[in-house]
Amino acid sequence: MKNKIVFTGSPDFAVESLQRLYDNPNNEIQLVISQEDKKRNRNKFSPTAVKKRAMELGIDVITPKNINDEEVFDLLDKLNPDFIVVVAYGQLIKKRILDRFKNKILNVHASILPKYRGASPINYSLLNGDKESGVSIMLVEQGLDTGDVLAVDKIKLDNEIMLEELHDKLMIMGADLINKVIDDYQKYFDSRKEQNENEASIVGKIHKSMGQINFNEKSDVIYNKFRGLTPWPGLFFKLEDKIIKVHNINIIKQYNDNKNGEVVKVDKNGIKVACEDGFIIITRLQLPNKKPLNISEYLNGNSFEEGIIL
């Protein structure tokens, strides 16, 4: 018999898992639950990436305001799935559903749990300069990402990997792993492990203000922010009340007696700004309401004063 699955998810990260579960001949996707359509502009509403894919695949999809509503519970109770798979859905599932489907609700989480429970694990693995990242499949319980872990897959990180690349790697790894777990569920369930609360950390949502460069920080910290916050919110600095977005940087570790934030040199190779333990070289930037430019292009029609403090 096929595994009957209800899939809950919303953003791009969840689409690969949905697709792979759908493609697996051992599975039957009974229903997809996603977040409500979001208003974009001029009263136009856009579906989530998961809803869009579900519709393309011809799968029934609902977008309840609250997944814990009575009518959703009744529908789930009637469908009686073997598994409810949760991938970046965006709402917490409460006790009634958890009790009804005990040990049947599986979550794909983009970190090596118990590290980085919460909303932004991929960002924080780069912000903190981690040397490895990964995905975990866990049982969903009432706590935030606190359930027993059924499986983990890890990846080594170099200093060059950026947010979008890591996102896509973990997206594929998560899709692979959830398929393996469901295909051989009893084996993974029997070897499940409790999370060590002493090693747990929780990360919140990413906010736009986090992208502002603080030149009092060390070069590695600034570079890791560039890796972990690009493309959104992206790095930026303020100049005469203008927000200047930064699209590429290099770093130089070198003792200097310049003030942090001082623009030391400006030429076609970049804007050289002093920081706590060296220099940040800004090689591509974007003025408000303009397209991104390499510094050599920028200097063709603009100037940037040396000696100012950013």
Curated annotation (Swiss-Prot):
Molecular-function GO terms, alphabetical: methionyl-tRNA formyltransferase activity
Catalysed conversion reaction: L-methionyl-tRNA(fMet) + (6R)-10-formyltetrahydrofolate = N-formyl-L-methionyl-tRNA(fMet) + (6S)-5,6,7,8-tetrahydrofolate + H(+)
Protein name: Methionyl-tRNA formyltransferase
Signal peptide: none
Keyword Manganese included in the entry's annotation: no
GO CC terms in record: cytosol
Species annotation: Finegoldia magna (strain ATCC 29328 / DSM 20472 / WAL 2508)
EC code(s) of this entry: 2.1.2.9
Protein's gene: fmt
Entry keyword Transferase: yes
Gene3D superfamilies in the record: 3.40.50.12230
